[in-house]
Amino acid sequence: MVTLRRRRTRCLLLLVVASTVVSAGAQESLVTGRVELFDAESPKKEANAPDVVVWLEPAAGAPSVTRLTNSSQAQVLRLVQEHKSFHPRLLVVEVGASVEFPNHDPFFHNVFSLFEGKRFDLGLYEAGTSYMVHFDRRGVSYIFCNIHPEMSAVVMALNTPFFGVSDSKGNVAIPGVPRGRYVLRIWHERATPDALKSLSREVTISEDSRSFGVLRVVETTALNLAHKNKYGQDYVPPLPSNPAYRRP
């Protein structure tokens, strides 16, 4: 009799837990919106608006929230080096995530980031090898190669799982957002900090409000995106493919 009661109690507890999870999951929303890019030198809207990061942080006084679905911390994240380029060009992760840097080129690379965000230097490593980097602090990490100056990427570590990156048409989707009050923030590589800060605002996600609307971002080509090597010096120009002298 006692055993039967214990079984019933366990079943009731399982039902309560399951119903709580389902109920919480039903409160999650797919938050959508759109980004438009404008050139600071011209009022004309850009045709494409990719790689704009939009994320949501719990507003002051709002209860803390957790996404039930898997976060980027549990995923295998990679920034591949191939054809003297990083793929993808932009990677957004949660703080605490690890990113793999495999070398798929038939020659050496030297990946480093010494300016903002996570600071590291992987040194020279050959084709077919790979290294992991743990992004344990919030911020934007600009990734370069000490051998090939044309290689660059960005890893952005956020203290929230609720983020999305715009596609080529400017569409943004942030999945699994629980209902509540949030602060919306935005980042774009060619926008000034003041321009980005002006777009930040508080939003409320509810059954009737699942869109943050249209964000109009002004980008500027005046921002200097050039960089030095890991020693703070200019890159050595590559040797010419043809000899400088002529045959007699």
Specify the residue positions occupied by each region the protein language model found:
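Bacterial N-terminal signal peptides that target proteins for export
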Residues: 2-12
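Bacterial N-terminal signal peptides
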Residues: 11-20
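Sec/Tat signal peptide C-region and signal peptidase I cleavage site
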Residues: 22-26
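Extracytoplasmic copper-binding redox domains, predominantly the cupredoxin/blue-copper superfamily
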Residues: 27-248
